[in-house]
């Protein structure tokens, strides 16, 4: 997986890379498995035995490119979270020709 981030002057590139990797991991887990279901008014997934998360052995290698900039540092936040679902959906479309429009993908039987 490859990502790029433009956050102004990179004060600490290692922290920026770690933040992007973590955001991508969180977003990927949510896109693949993040279903929350209710039964009789209660959440069925009460702990990690019933709520699937992305495990470390399923985390892809992430290459982080920091865009060189002379702008003031802006902070990194979680920019890796939001685009990962659409990126995976587009990759699946490129591979299969089928559009996936429901998240998590596991809810549609495609994860």
Language model segments and positions:
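Cofactor-binding beta-sheet edge motifs in enzyme active sites
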Residues: 1-111
